[in-house]
Amino acid sequence: METSNFYNEILTEHNIRPYHKHDMPDATFSLNGVNPSCGDDITLKLKVVDDVIEDASFIGDGCAISQASADIMADMVIGRSKEEALRLAEMFIRMIKGSVTNEEIDELEEAGALKDISHMPARVKCAVLGWHTLQEIFEKNEDANT
Amino acid sequence: METSNFYNEILTEHNIRPYHKHDMPDATFSLNGVNPSCGDDITLKLKVVDDVIEDASFIGDGCAISQASADIMADMVIGRSKEEALRLAEMFIRMIKGSVTNEEIDELEEAGALKDISHMPARVKCAVLGWHTLQEIFEKNEDANT
Amino acid sequence: MSINVNISHREDFPLLRDSNIVYLDNAATSQKPDCVIEAVEEFYHKHNANPLRGFYELAMLATEQLENSRTTVKEFINAKFEEEVIFTKGTTESINLIANSYGMNFLGEGDEILISIMEHHCNILPWQFVASKTGAVLKYLECDMDGLISDTAIEEAITDKTKIVAITQLSNVLGRENPIARITKTAHEHGAIVVMDAAQSVVHVKIDVQALDVDFMAFSGHKIMSPMGIGILYGKKELLNKMPPFLRGGEMIESVTRTDAVFAQLPYKFEAGTDNASGAVGLMAAINYINSIGMEYMHERTLMLTKMCFDAICKIPHIHIIGAKDSNNHNGIISFTIDNVHPHDVSQILSESNVCVRAGHHCAQPLCDFLGFKSCTRASFMFYNTQEDIDTFIKSLSGIRKMMGYGD
Amino acid sequence: MSINVNISHREDFPLLRDSNIVYLDNAATSQKPDCVIEAVEEFYHKHNANPLRGFYELAMLATEQLENSRTTVKEFINAKFEEEVIFTKGTTESINLIANSYGMNFLGEGDEILISIMEHHCNILPWQFVASKTGAVLKYLECDMDGLISDTAIEEAITDKTKIVAITQLSNVLGRENPIARITKTAHEHGAIVVMDAAQSVVHVKIDVQALDVDFMAFSGHKIMSPMGIGILYGKKELLNKMPPFLRGGEMIESVTRTDAVFAQLPYKFEAGTDNASGAVGLMAAINYINSIGMEYMHERTLMLTKMCFDAICKIPHIHIIGAKDSNNHNGIISFTIDNVHPHDVSQILSESNVCVRAGHHCAQPLCDFLGFKSCTRASFMFYNTQEDIDTFIKSLSGIRKMMGYGD
Ligand SMILES: Cc1ncc(COP(=O)(O)O)c(C=O)c1O
Ligand SMILES: Cc1ncc(COP(=O)(O)O)c(C=O)c1O
């Protein structure tokens, strides 16, 4: 586990200069996700039109991993359909559990920068917080939205 | 600790053929003493006239040590004054705790056969049950009797 | 399975290896093999940190050890989920947890708690307490003089009023295995839950909580060759989920304010305070050791030793074995009385020949009362005992009445 | 006392001796010296039996070891009587015992429980529970931003309604020693009892329960170099005598019938189940080790290390130490925040240099809220830490903001 490699530029950049950390007045979904034991706390906001994520943002605070991971996620899901976003979420969570192929890591783009979390059980929750919240938004609203 | 020496003739004799294990209809004092954790259970009976123990007996059951010790005690205190009996009780209990002189052990006569109990913490309660009950009888009745 | 009585496992146990002790008090606590003692040592040499708390490597190693142990226990008892396995300090704490968290909160006036007459005090007193506080009624399920709990007794004792049946899988006095699956079935038909005390059985019977369908199960590590101070509570997830915590403190919370707290998920909700990780590691090593020797083999060997001893005792006059007439129903436990010799004297005389047995009421006074004696002597075996152990024991036992001054 | 910083005690601790770990999470748990690990091993090699139960020699040895440990603890904390020393599995169990046995039975509607704002969750949640069940009111005694509890605060908070004051002798976040004797005096004037959490203090402050006049006191062995799974509850005899038992089972009874039980004398009334004798033996070895090193020397050394580290941190920009400005008020505990870097990231980055520190709310969320942060990083020292440890820590700490992408 090489931490200095781990806190790489992708991660630190998304942490200190997040693109998508802001409010979204016209969001169609908003959900709070927390890791109570860590104190990580984000509110994910999505603007979904016809099952396509037109915009994504988050507010909140927490460790660099939770914040950067949420920011990277927002970046990735904007413009994607609900199904594609959920497929990425599933893939990301699998990566964190240590069972993805190299092709899949490539597909995860910048989120692949978090793959070493699979060796850091204590940080798993931080990395997946954003993605879990995304999944929850769509699960909770499945009925309403179909 | 040589147990075979310990269960000597004095002890086994007093255990299986106790002289004083019987009821006493004209007892002036009767008190039940128990070691709940061991199950030792005796009722000590004394006939005290003018502060002199005219007769002593016990009923009940328990291990050889508790029974033999009670029987030996009864033997020793018959004919003695309350004060002398209490002095012997104090001496006996000290012997069990391992702090008596050889002269004192001699004075304890047959009760001296129990001196090795001082090396058997688990059996101390058994050996002193009779003597404790004797002390209790006189303590409880101090006011009534003076 | 064919057991060679001449093969000895004594060598694995330093206390036995380095002494001439004839240890026949295995039902009180077991001896520990080198591998268990060394596992604890290794934990302190290499992995010691407060588990579940840190982000540094050592703390993660400690956490991993603790959770590996949980997984090992889960497989050992065939639980469905890891989070159904809760670390406690022993059977006594586990049962008190159930009584305080489940009993106190889900019982009321007129409900019935059924326990067997052969329970250990730790499966009696917590229920007396619950009964006194909730107004529930404590009832007893009785056995016959052979220690058998009959189907009829079960059918009669369990009614729609019964809410909890708490019973040992194996009596620490009688050694007989109780018909748990039978009891669970009847209890569930009447809507009652079953708490199984596995303190004695865990080392003799392969436990399968799913097959037995028990709702709660408890055992202590120290009786299965693991260190002292660690034990297990198993509970079905849906029950544990609806129960409030028992001990309260660190690790079992999600968040705390001045006035309130949100509790953590299972299993942590029930593991307040620093977990005994070294104990858990020792327990894991003990289970691995058991698996390497083979549970079935261990049990067969114990039964063989039990039979040898049982048959020999039967030949000594004035000795009366308590419970079943068939040694196969004794599972390593032989309790007995000797005419006119008190068990404490028996135990002390045996101790002279380095034979360690237990004497007394064995924390089962209601059973002693029921069977009509105050106390008894108990010899209990594990697979690491030897034929020599039994020979020494029998020889010393045979001379006791004479030593106590009796003619025969 | 003059302390030579170059003398190292690291050699006594196998985990430190055989690695390059910089262990600064001592407030979570301590490392164990060889003598403690070996004492546990020796117990299993030579004395292992179920204590308090047997009449054979091995059982008496086990009992003797357990009781010797009790005597050692009695002297260590200067209790008046052996039977005031009760073995538990740790601070958390000890405090839960007090809350459940004393709190639940001697408090009622309108009574007040006073705890400090800096309590560990295990000295908060049990009282929240007691308050919710008995109708008592839970109040908080506050400190200032330096962690000081003033005389005025004490005088105002303790009233005739106060029945229990539960307070830590040393905060696990602030490291500051609280004025316990002062609190006890006021509490007693108002007829309240005092429960002291000594989990953190026991390794830094020479505890004298009689001089402090506390009514109850609790600590865990694992924080003072003894094995996990053992802890102490001290209570004044007259209070313990009038309290009902907490855990119920074997060993804590005199006699049991189907419907009732007579409880044993102190200390056994509160020690249901098989005692963790090997844990007690380890605790005894740890106390003997402490006595051989010298409590005062240990503390002086810790203060010196604390000061070195404190002064160095003060020179790093963007780092804020929590609590007192004087390092002598930190007793081996330095908690801090770094601007814009989350403590979990701090801890993980330090871990890269083998530095073990803890990050989070440290089981003291109400204190964090009160002081205005969600979490912080904590470095905590024991006498076996070295100047090198601190150098490595400071070096790594200095580079964190840069590593996280900040310009300075
Ligand atoms: C002040 C304080 N109290 C109580 C505890 C709890 O101790 P344990 O987890 O050993 O029960 C701790 C340590 O975690 C502590 O620092
Ligand atoms: C059947 C049974 N249940 C419970 C216990 C209690 O176990 P522990 O003392 O380890 O809590 C014992 C052993 O003493 C036992 O034999």
Label each residue range with its predicted role.
Chain A
Residues 1-25, 82-146:
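C-terminal binding/interaction regions
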Residues 60, 78-79, 130:
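A generic structural motif
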Residues 17-56, 60:
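Structured beta-strand/loop patches that form or line metal/cofactor-binding pockets in enzymes
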Residues 61-67:
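Short, thiol/selenol-centered motifs that function as redox-active sites or metal-ligating centers
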